[in-house]
Amino acid sequence: MVIGAGNAPHAGEVFLQLGETGGCTSGGEEEHINNRSWISFNTSSNMFELVDDTKATWPVNWVKWYGAYAFAQYYTASLPTEAQWECAAQGGQQLEYPTNDGTLDLTKANYNGDTPGVYNPNGHSVAVGSYPANPYGLYDMGGNVWEWCQDYYGESFYIDGAIDPVNTSAGPNNKRVRRGGSWNYHSATLLTYWRASDFENRGNNHFGFRIVKQAE
């Protein structure tokens, strides 16, 4: 685990949950080795290090919302708002799925088929660019790993029709938005308008993020 320190945003919070090799799923199956954390934290240098050089182009996983937020701030960027994420996912064409043509099959994204609630013990994330980009040139907006958004989650917030909305109200559950589905989730969760949420301090093998930065 890595703890935010100093004057960093959310100092004292756990940013990253480092997954171990050889774990088991809640159903008792052995977890795929590629679902371990492929980065480690060197306490001597105070820096992250790659455990496996072959994973350099894979999406980071096990990241909690705090860690994703802090990373974005460190690079003077931000997490996408939910509205920004959906706009990017649709590729300027109101796509149903955030693929190259708005349709979905297993040649276009890394996900777990069409049946809800089925865990894939052989599943794992894959390298970015393994599937075609969407019309904006963005890879893996659907599947691979869920992506944290900046907003707090509100069940009815996003249907009010506001332009470029950002939900800054924590609400009763204090959850943040995540979008895009993952290798471990079924096809419906990859829809460009499918919404999900989770607690800020939760990370696992299918939670990741991407950042946005204003063009200079």
Listing of model-derived features with the role each one plays in the protein:
Residues V2-L18:
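N-terminal low-complexity segments that are often proline-rich with Ser/Thr-Pro
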Residues E13-V14, G22-S26:
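Aromatic- and Gly/Pro-rich amphipathic surface segment
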Residues C24, G28, I33-N35, I39-A196, ...:
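Functional-site microenvironments in short loops/helix caps that host divalent-cation chemistry
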Residues N205-E216:
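Short, structured beta-strand segments at or near domain termini in extracellular proteins/domains
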